[in-house]
């Protein structure tokens, strides 16, 4: 009967990041501002009136795709109210953690790249279009766009990658059932 459920929003939100009981997301209706929802009170506040997509909060920084500037990758300092451009390349997706940012460059020379979380030392991990970038403390995992059956992984901060056979084998075993 849904009597124990509370509607938090009457429109779709992208809960891109959650930290200490706060969900951060960008606007999808009238603007692309950064919003925060306190999960204890269900209260929503505007954090920053930027034009951003897919915000990820790490410490004092909000990493995001800059909608106004062709989806380049930036970070915003919450305490200093300052924007830093990490790359001017147009990106499709990214993830950040453990001192690194992994991101998919869009365009004719599409590739998966890595940089330090301050924007320094970028390098190519793999040529082509990749998505579903996930990180652990030791590895980054990703898939080639359009191929849901294969996963790849790379030791965090390295320049090499390989097929993650355990994921492929689990998928094949599931198909046999």
Language-model segment annotations:
Residues 24-26, 63-65, 102-104, 141-143:
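Residue position within the beta-strands of beta-propeller blades
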Residues 4-9, 42-48, 81-87, 120-126:
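A short beta-strand motif characteristic of beta-propeller blades
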Residues 1, 19, 30, 58, ...:
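Short loop/turn segments that connect beta-strands within the blades of beta-propeller domains
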Residues 1-3, 37-42, 76-81, 115-120, ...:
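Short loop/turn segments that connect beta-strands within beta-propeller blades
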Residues 10-20, 49-59, 88-98, 127-137, ...:
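Repeated scaffold domains used in trafficking and secretory/extracellular systems
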Residues 129-177:
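Blade-level signature of beta-propeller repeat domains, shared across WD40, Kelch, NHL, RCC1
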Residues 66, 86-113, 117-134:
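Intrinsically disordered, low-complexity segments enriched in Gly and acidic/Ser/Thr residues
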């Amino acid at each position: 009967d849904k009597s124990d459920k509370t509607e938090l929003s009457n429109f779709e939100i992208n809960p891109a990041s959650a930290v200490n009981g706060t969900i951060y997301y960008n606007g999808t209706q009238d603007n692309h501002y950064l919003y925060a929802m306190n999960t204890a009170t269900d209260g929503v506040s505007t954090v920053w009136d930027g034009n951003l997509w897919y915000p990820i909060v790490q410490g004092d920084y909000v990493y995001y795709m800059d909608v106004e500037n062709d989806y380049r990758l930036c970070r915003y300092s919450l305490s200093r109210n300052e924007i830093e451009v990490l790359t001017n390349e147009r990106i499709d997706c990214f993830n950040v953690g453990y001192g690194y940012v992994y991101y998919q460059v869009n365009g004719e020379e599409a590739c998966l790249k890595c940089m330090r979380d301050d924007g320094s030392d970028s390098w190519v991990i793999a040529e082509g279009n990749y998505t579903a970038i996930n990180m652990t403390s030791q590895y980054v995992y990703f898939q080639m766009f359009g191929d849901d059956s294969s996963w790849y992984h790379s030791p965090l901060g390295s320049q090499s990658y390989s097929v993650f056979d355990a994921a492929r084998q689990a998928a094949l075993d599931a198909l046999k059932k």
